[in-house]
Amino acid sequence: MRDSSRFVALFRRSFIAFAAIAALFAAQLPAPGQSSNFNPALPLTHVGNAPNSAWAQRQHYVVLVSLDGFRWDYARRDRAEHLLALGRHGVWAPEGMLPSYPSLTFPNHFTIVTGLYPEHHGLVANSFYDPARNARYSMSDPKAVTDGSWYSGAPLWSLAESQGMHAAILLWPGSEAEIAGFRPTWYAHFDAKTEASPEALQARIDNVVALLDLAPEDRPHFIAIYYSEPDHEGHEFGPDAAETRKAVLKMDAEIGKLKAALDKTGLSIDLVVVSDHGMVRSEGPWINLDSFADLKGFDAVGPLLYATSEDDRVRVYNQLKKAASQFTVYRLKNVPAELNYNQNPRSGDPVAVATGPYAIRAHAPDAGLTDHPPTIGMHGFDPAKVPEMKASFFAAGPDILPGKTVAPFENVNLYPWIAHMLDLKPAKNDGSLNILAGTLVDNGADQENNRSNPE
């Protein structure tokens, strides 16, 4: 009897140990739909969205890449061979693409994927205040960035997921939040400390290849990838510095590696490479708005001014009107229509618009806080006044006619164009497929909506 009890106890201990080892082993295995080939230098979060529909599995693929701060003329200036080759084999904008105002990173990245001007999708700056919420948004605040209630519109990844198509988004602004009821099936969390490391650069390519190697029911058909260079170098050293030129060629080499990797998959992939804005050498010291007006009664975020009193708005507007020539001041409702920046209270009121590459802010830091001069390179300006703000556009693939060039166009028009290539029905947007329809093999037939209703 004692021997039997000892046997049972031994069996139980062995079984528990075996189960623990098995559980540990299972935890290290990829979940269904995952790949064991993902590069851990850029961890991906997997959301359990429904598999690709039969309709989605028949569609082509689009890989959208953004090179932050890659000015419209960098490729030709620095002989970026891979980007120029992409343009020769497909389409490009030799004179650049027009960013939306303000020509800043978060507003324009979200414009590219929603087709909405910043005043309509809500990201009116990289950082701003919302009077209705009595809260601030900042691109450096993880809590705000991952809160989908800040964003309006249906980004391409939400559009795809809502119509039965998987998407994978690698570091694109806005992709860490649930927006329009969806998250991308795959996404990566942004880590400013590591995202530009050589390991993270290689991981982008490795993970795209691994994603495209998934089974058809799991494979994403829309992939978006964000790179922070050459924006950093442009800010720190200026757009014409040797360091910036080196970063331009570095990113061109990354595009070359990505293109070669995509070609090896044998899939029908349209590769689209854009930037969010350009870069210009800043002129002069900070322009502090409180040097020209008494901002008592105002909150401020950067150059954006917020007051609860209409009397304060009128007073400061009249004071700023008499100011120096480096900016023009408007009441919010009177901001010129061509800027598409006169409807959203998040933009502040009054609104100061720089007339050149001048660094504007409400006021210097409070006493005791460190102040810094403006960065050597800057952006955020109206491209009509500062043409260096123009962005880049290159694309090639089975849906794109070769040897095409396009005149400068507004970046809101990318959204319906990419949606068309994926056969998606676009959400309401400020763009038009007609602008880029002539670059498509099918000439944009059967759109503005979509070529066939997904089922």
Where would I find each of the regions flagged by the language model?
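Metal-dependent active-site segment of extracytoplasmic phospho-/sulfohydrolases and closely related
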Residues: 64, 82, 250-288
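N-terminal secretory signal peptides that target proteins for export/translocation
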Residues: 1-11
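Polar, surface-exposed loop/tail segments
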Residues: 321-323, 329-347, 424-453
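A long, amphipathic alpha-helix that forms part
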Residues: 44, 55-57, 198-213, 230-271, ...
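Active-site neighborhoods of enzymes that stabilize oxyanions during catalysis
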Residues: 153, 298-405, 409-420
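Active-site nucleophile/metal-coordination loop of metallo-enzymes that catalyze phosphate/sulfate
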Residues: 34-59, 72-162, 178
